[in-house]
Amino acid sequence: MRTQDGEKVVPGLQRRLGTFDAVMIGLGAMIGAGLFSAFTPAASAAGSALLVSLVLASAIAYANARSSAQLAARYPTSGGTYAYGREVLGPWPGFIAGWGFVVGKTASAAAMALTFATYTVPGPWVKPVATVAVAVLVGVNCLGVTRTAAAARIIVTAVLALLAVVLIVILAGGHAPPEYVAGTNHGVFGVLQGAGLLFFAFAGYARIATLGEEVRNPSRSIPRAIGIGLGIVVVLYAAVALVLIDVLGTAGIAQSPKPLATAVGDSWALPLVQVAAALASLGALLALVAGIGRTAMAMARENDLPRALSAVHPRFATPLRAELVVGAAILVLIAFFDLGTAIGFSSFGVLVYYLITNISAARQPKNERLGPVWLGVAGAAGCAVLVASLPVSAVIGGLVMFTVGLGYRATRLRLGG
């Protein structure tokens, strides 16, 4: 495409979304597989202190959200903390954030697809169906962000309505024995590990920050959307946790791979749980693919990933190549990861991403801050503690992937790429 003067025009992203659209896309990313799968490993880790883990994860998520909103107001561009980190801290911290987001969220997407399939088909069909779901939703994302936003609105509305009915049915069904409600106390480390695993369920608000080039009036809309979205999700997760503890107890949650389905039992509401889980997982997967693709595009613009991934499709205004590569990477993880491994691996990458987010926000000048410096410092410290508390397999896998990423960037710089 060229101008009348014969100059080549490079297609770019377009500002088509309002605050409501951004909130819905963020909710679609947060009300996902975490609601239906993260409580089990978190209850196994935290035991009777599951609610303490939830409060801790919520507090750190709040600090991260404030830092994300503050940075988005100053740097309304695609890439989220990858872009913010480069501007505030320099290219290497920015790369670490971007790599953490791409790797961690790719694992999140694999977890979403596996959760969707787990709730809809028998065991032998889980991975094939998860593969098909990824292929279809990558295709939807490639058609444009307005289609992504429309799909998110439908999915989020349906999931919230279904969950309201399911929670009422569960509460009417009875209560857990006192010893199941009390559970076992696994100590401070268990609380921290539980919070780290539950953080997987909150981290979708990062998707809103990656919309910097597609939201109208981003300096105002993105901070508002992040705050509204996180507030809704914290209330929802607290309600679900309280209901599950009341009906199953923390011991019962830890023993069930599908705690909401177990709480419903064989009642008429079981299909509603399955439909809600499927829709929520698909909604999160839809939002994740778009967010990862845009961060990969931003990294490719700076030569931190292959330059070809920076291309924007002239008709659909989407980073088509980046999203296709992201889709392929998700399929690889589905082939080799189980759900629990994907959740732990995702938490590692995303917590590192938010560690850089909080440090960047704390370094901003006073006139750019939306909150006190100590909030960013506390958020960074919280992320560091939760990373160190994750399961050993997640920590080792995360360190290996970051070593690969840092080696890749160092090699590109040395070769002049």
Regions found by a protein language model. Name each.
Residues 305-313, 355-371, 416:
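Alpha-helical transmembrane segments
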Residues 1-38, 45-49, 61-62, 66, ...:
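Membrane-interface "cap" regions at the ends of multi-pass membrane proteins
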Residues 349, 362-417:
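A generic transmembrane alpha-helix motif of multi-pass inner-membrane proteins
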Residues 41-44, 53, 62-142, 147, ...:
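Hydrophobic transmembrane alpha-helices that form the core helical bundles
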Residues 3-4, 9-13, 51, 124, ...:
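Helix-loop-helix junctions that connect adjacent transmembrane segments
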Residues 55, 59-63, 103, 131-139, ...:
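Generic alpha-helical transmembrane segments of integral inner-membrane proteins
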Residues 83-84, 90, 122, 227-289, ...:
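TM-loop-TM module centered on a large, flexible mid-protein loop between adjacent transmembrane helices
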Residues 45-48, 76-80, 87-93, 213-223, ...:
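Juxtamembrane helix-boundary/capping and inter-helix hinge elements in multi-pass membrane proteins
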